[in-house]
């Protein structure tokens, strides 16, 4: 019996040692995982962007074996912070992708799908239905609100739409303005609805989302013109990023399903639902050429001439 007891104690001790070694090995494995950062362009504000894309960052960490850190970045600071090497992966709107591709040879990973046009979207110029305005040429001397200047479908696409219709916004319009603060696209749509401006540059996706959420009725507006469809938000990677990791991240994005979840603050969260997206699609750099042509006509980065 004494021999059996000694054997049992020895076995238990050995098992404890093995468990401890396994735990230490696991800890070391986690500690030794590579660490990288993803810069996310702030959409409406930092808080909203954090809530939307923290689960996405966690998902990419789980799928690639890299500890990715979420980094919120102001649109106007994005290129400067990327150039400094603060982050190697990017999530931004499509004009920032074009700028970073032109200046820093950014690698295209995948394009975000959201709304009825999937990985593409468009800009529109809207007026109230009862405004009496039925075509772009009737905006002469009128007030119009645009989105931020680096908003592809809130500024660039609509400005270009006017130019292609023979209208110089600088001399043709009465005045134009950009709302202050967050949620600029929503504010523009409301400004048109409540008569604060005569017309607005509204992303078609915002009209779709606000209508679906019951905030507006599209029947209250007339779309005077719509731009061609252009790519929506885009994931990219710095040109010196390890190729195998680039492919891992691309595959993880393209494989993302509505049922995929991660744990955030002790709660299981659906990644796509949290990010307000419908998945990702693999576009080519050539698909971004319409943005390049718009930017050249509008005299915008990365092609502006002073």
Q: What function would you assign to each model-found segment?
A:
Residues 36-39, 44-58, 237, 241-306:
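An extracytoplasmic/periplasmic, membrane-proximal ligand-sensing/linker region
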Residues 106-118, 172-176, 211-229:
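Short beta-strand->loop
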Residues 70-80, 169-190, 229:
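Short helix-initiation/N-cap motifs at beta->coil->alpha
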Residues 94-104, 158, 163-164, 191-219:
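A ligand-binding cleft/hinge motif common to bilobed small-molecule-binding domains
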Residues 31-98:
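Extracytoplasmic small-molecule ligand-binding "clamshell" domains
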Residues 33, 127-148:
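Flexible hinge/capping segments at coil-to-helix
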Residues 54-64, 116, 154-181, 208-216, ...:
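Ligand-binding cleft/hinge of the Venus flytrap
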Residues 41-42, 122-133, 229-244:
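A bilobed periplasmic-binding-protein/Venus flytrap-type ligand-binding module shared by bacterial periplasmic
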């Amino acid at each position: 019996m004494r021999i059996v007891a000694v054997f049992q104690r020895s076995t238990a001790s050995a098992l404890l040692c093995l468990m401890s070694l396994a735990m230490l090995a696991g800890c070391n494995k986690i500690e030794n995982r590579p660490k990288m950062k993803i810069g996310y362009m702030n959409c409406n504000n930092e808080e909203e962007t954090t809530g939307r894309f923290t689960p996405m960052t966690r998902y990419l960490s789980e799928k690639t074996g890299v500890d990715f850190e979420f980094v919120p970045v102001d649109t106007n600071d994005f290129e400067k912070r990327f150039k400094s090497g603060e982050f190697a992966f990017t999530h931004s709107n499509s004009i920032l992708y074009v700028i970073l591709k032109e200046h820093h040879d950014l690698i295209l990973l995948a394009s975000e799908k959201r709304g009825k046009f999937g990985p593409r979207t468009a800009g529109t110029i809207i007026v109230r239905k009862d405004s009496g305005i039925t075509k772009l040429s009737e905006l002469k001397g009128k007030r119009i609100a645009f989105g931020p200047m680096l908003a592809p479908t809130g500024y660039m696409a609509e400005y270009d739409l006017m130019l292609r219709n023979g209208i110089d916004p600088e001399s043709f319009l009465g005045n134009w303005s950009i709302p202050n603060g967050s949620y600029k696209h929503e504010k523009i749509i409301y400004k048109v609805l409540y008569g604060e401006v005569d017309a607005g540059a509204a992303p078609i996706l915002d009209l779709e989302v606000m209508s679906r959420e019951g905030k507006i009725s599209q029947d209250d507006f007339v779309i005077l013109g719509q731009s061609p469809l252009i790519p929506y938000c885009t994931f990219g990677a710095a040109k010196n990023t390890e190729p195998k990791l680039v492919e891992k991240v691309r595959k993880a994005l393209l494989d993302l399903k509505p049922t995929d979840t991660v744990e955030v603050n002790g709660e299981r969260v659906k990644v796509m639902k949290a990010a307000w997206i419908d998945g990702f699609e693999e576009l080519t750099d050539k698909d971004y050429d319409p943005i390049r042509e718009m930017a050249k006509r509008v005299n915008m980065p990365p092609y502006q001439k002073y």
